[in-house]
């Protein structure tokens, strides 16, 4: 029996090889297999958003004006979520709700579902693009792993949270002021700022900003003076092989400042990757919990004492009262289809009132 070792070569290229050669060709803008998902989905998501914010009203879903055509500006325009009565329908243009009528589809909130789903797949396509390029140039895939953080947040907030609630209606609309309203909603109905997963997310994002500032300043501080240029950008050749700054000097500086410092670049840069990505993932997990209506921290003993003792109040009990006020005011404003009416006597009043 003879075993032949060697690389198998095909006599002629099949369709897959031809497509692979064209998609992965070296060009100004890399396409790749991931581009088949990324570019169409990104085009449709952005196109849907620009169309919605320019022309489409939210009168039939939220009782609001939300387009430039109606007088909104960049901060107040939005592509609004579908009506609560449509629950979790995919709102396909050819589906039973719109029945192929594009105008009706826009009025019902079909553009939101269109933008959300295509946006999610576009983000996934962008992550796959980073995987594909990393593999092509023999890099490790940490860029793609890092980008999983924003994807996790987007999917949890825009898709998983409303799936856990009664419908897409309770997802954020795609607009600046609309996102602000959603944040207030999260605080009032879920006490989001006291949720430990939100705390970890804030620590991750702000900690990452601090790390970036410290790292950038430290590198600038310890640059080798081996160029004739007057500033950082002229003094160094962008293709030079040698290092441009002194890790040893940086280590000594921070050892004197804090008493501790990173001793090697791998651990330093892994930490800069770990902090924000972990923070984003923790936030995403917290939002998944909110989809299931899991509660934040409750300090019931303080609430009971505040109810019994007019002179006892903490920042926590004041925030609980504020949340009740947000719910009482926002529910009626935010869900006009429910015809909610709250009499004056049930509205929250703090000890100071």
From Swiss-Prot:
Organism, as annotated: Arabis hirsuta
Other comment: 2 of the reaction center chlorophylls (ChlD1 and ChlD2) are entirely coordinated by water.
Enzyme class at the top of the EC tree: oxidoreductase
Family to which the UniProt record says this protein belongs: Belongs to the reaction center PufL/M/PsbA/D family.
Residues engaged in binding pheophytin a: 130, 143
Protein name: Photosystem II D2 protein
Binding site for Fe cation: 215, 269
A GO biological-process term: photosynthetic electron transport in photosystem II
């Amino acid at each position: 029996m003879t075993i032949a070792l060697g690389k198998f070569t095909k006599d002629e290229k099949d369709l897959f090889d031809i497509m692979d050669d064209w998609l992965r060709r070296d060009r100004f803008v890399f396409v790749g297999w991931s581009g088949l998902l990324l570019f169409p989905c990104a085009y449709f998501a952005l196109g849907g958003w620009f169309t919605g914010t320019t022309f489409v009203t939210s009168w039939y879903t939220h009782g609001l004006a939300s387009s430039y055509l109606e007088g909104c500006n960049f901060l107040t325009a939005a592509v609004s979520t579908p009506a609560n009565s449509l629950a979790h329908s995919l709102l396909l243009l050819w589906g039973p709700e719109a029945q192929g009528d594009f105008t009706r589809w826009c009025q019902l909130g079909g553009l939101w579902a269109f933008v959300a789903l295509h946006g999610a797949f576009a983000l996934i396509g962008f992550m796959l693009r980073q995987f594909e390029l990393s593999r092509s140039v023999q890099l490790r895939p940490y860029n793609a792993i890092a980008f999983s953080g924003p994807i996790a947040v987007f999917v949890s907030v825009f898709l998983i949270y409303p799936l856990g609630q009664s419908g897409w209606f309770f997802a954020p609309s795609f607009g600046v002021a609309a996102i602000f309203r959603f944040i207030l909603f999260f605080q009032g109905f879920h006490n989001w700022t006291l949720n430990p997963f939100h705390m970890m997310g804030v620590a991750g994002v702000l900690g990452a900003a601090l790390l970036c500032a410290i790292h950038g300043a430290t590198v600038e501080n310890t640059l080798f003076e081996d160029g004739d240029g007057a500033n950082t950008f002229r003094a160094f050749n962008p293709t030079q092989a040698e290092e441009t700054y002194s890790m040893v000097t940086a280590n000594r500086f921070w050892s004197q400042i804090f008493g501790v410092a990173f001793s090697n670049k791998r651990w330093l840069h892994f930490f800069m990757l770990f902090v924000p990505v972990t923070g984003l993932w923790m936030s995403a997990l917290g939002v998944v919990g909110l989809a299931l209506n899991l509660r934040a921290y409750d300090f019931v003993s303080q609430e009971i004492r505040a109810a019994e003792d007019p002179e006892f109040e903490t920042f926590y009990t004041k925030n609980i009262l504020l949340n009740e006020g947000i719910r009482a005011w926002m529910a009626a404003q935010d869900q006009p289809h429910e015809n909610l009416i709250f009499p004056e006597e049930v509205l929250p009043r703090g000890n100071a009132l």
